[in-house]
Amino acid sequence: MIYPYKGKTPQIAASAFIADYVTITGDVVIGEETSIWFNTVIRGDVAPTVIGNRVNIQDNSILHQSPNNPLIIEDGVTVGHQVILHSAIVRKNALIGMGSIILDRAEIGEGAFIGAGSLVPPGKKIPPNTLALGRPAKVVRELTEDDIREMERIRREYVEKGQYYKALQQQRTSCADKKELP
């Protein structure tokens, strides 16, 4: 469901895929070829949420903000299943592992990898191209070429899947308009 909030309506690129049972409210911008997967909630009712191009926000994630602290997700970011992002900045091509929590004013550097289940506390800065793990998250090493290739593969896969599902949605809508279901 897409809901306006106090005069702000989500702006979603035509090429973005928004799965069924996603809720998006208020001051939210979603870029080209971005995919938002099932049961995700993106609330822009406190401050803006800006999501770049070719981002994937996987199932059951929650995105929100604190007053005067927007949530910014740059191009090419992967957000794993059941992630909580709250008033953070996630730089280009980063990957946030499943079940992680990224809190207010944290900044995830370009190409950084946050391991599954990690907690990045308020204000913490994770350097570019590093792997951070734990609760609280600590940098454990620089990323390898294999890590970087795998992150790129995941990004490409989610863009392709998103476009596939987008085409299915359009086909379903077209059939429903004609009162024909496949």
Swiss-Prot record:
Homotrimer. Either Mg(2+) or Zn(2+) can occupy the active site. Highly thermostable. Is active at high temperatures (60 and 80 degrees Celsius). This is Carbonic anhydrase. InterPro entries: Hexapep, LbH_gamma_CA-like, Transf_Hexapept/Carb_Anhydrase, Trimer_LpxA-like_sf. Changing residue 43 to A: Retains 45% of wild-type activity. Its EC number is 4.2.1.1. The keyword Oxidoreductase does not apply. Reversible hydration of carbon dioxide. SUPFAM superfamilies: Trimeric LpxA-like enzymes. It catalyses: hydrogencarbonate + H(+) = CO2 + H2O. Changing residue 56 to A: Retains 65% of wild-type activity. Mg(2+) binds at residues 64, 81, 86. One of its GO terms (molecular function) is lyase activity. Keywords: Lyase, Magnesium, Metal-binding, Zinc. It comes from the Bacteria. Belongs to the gamma-class carbonic anhydrase family. Changing residue 64 to A: Retains 20% of wild-type activity. Changing residue 58 to A: Retains 20% of wild-type activity. Its cofactor is Mg(2+); Zn(2+).
